[in-house]
Amino acid sequence: SFVMGFMRSGTTLTQEVLDAHPDVFVADEVELVPALKRELHGIEKRGTSTAEKLALLDQSGVEHLRDFYWQKVYDRFGETIGDGLFVDKLTMNTIDVGLINCVFPDSKVIFVMRDPRDVCVSCFMQLMVPTPTTVQMLTWAGTSRFYALVMAWWSHVSKQLTLPFLELRYENVVANFEASYRNVFDFLGLPWDASVVDFHKRAAEKFVATPSRTQVTKPLYASSVGRWRSYESDMATISVSLDPFIDEFKYRQ
């Protein structure tokens, strides 16, 4: 299964809750799917874009990519993954969800959502290591434009996915943690385990590879919901980018 979304949307929280379940192993921000995409571009010489190459790929090519992915998993984690559910959490796998749909058509995707305004405030104010992704968010306008590009892609591609996916709202998690994650575990075909309620205690004992590491080692709190209201005047300057998604995702109040 896969956990994805947009940065600062709550993917790390979901990762830690899932990882607290005894029958789940979560790979935290490990570039397994990006490696898979590079392998696709290496074995399929026809076409130029990832989509074109996937369309030209035969079944043996799909099976090769599937084997390649799992070899990467075992090279990295070995037998520590156990025999439970393996979850690949890389937030920006959103961009490559079409590749996932092709290679792993029986997998499940949890797509974590949050109010676009809170996402952009949090991304812009968070100190992040420079990467090809994070450099898109060095300015207020750049942050909103990048968010709009990624979420427009999700809005488009999610209608074409054949694999099952669940959209999980951060605000619902904060308002009703247990009901939200009971729904998640039911979607994944796993029984509820009360130990996940104390996810923050487990997270405090290990390394978390994202800027959210300080938040997920504490009990859940609601202060980050509606944080954008403190910057309401600044929101007007990026409304052209965010308004379509505020409406589409029903965050208009």
Question: PLM features: residue spans?
Answer:
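Phosphate-binding active sites in nucleotide-utilizing proteins
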Residues: S1-F104, V112
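Conserved nucleotide-binding/hydrolysis micro-motifs of P-loop NTPases
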Residues: E31-V33, P116-V119, V173-V174
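Conserved beta-strand scaffold positions in the cores of enzyme catalytic domains, especially
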Residues: V26, V109, F165-E167
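Acidic, metal-coordinating catalytic cores used for nucleic-acid/nucleotide bond scission
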Residues: T91, N172-N176
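PAPS-dependent sulfotransferases, especially Golgi type II membrane carbohydrate sulfotransferases
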Residues: S1, R46-L85, C123-E167, A175-Q253
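A secondary-structure boundary/capping signal
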Residues: E29, R169-Y170
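Conserved phosphate-donor/acceptor-positioning beta-strand/loop module used by diverse small-molecule
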Residues: I100-F124
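Conserved coil-to-alpha-helix start sites within the AMP-binding
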Residues: T94-V97, D118-V119, M151-A152
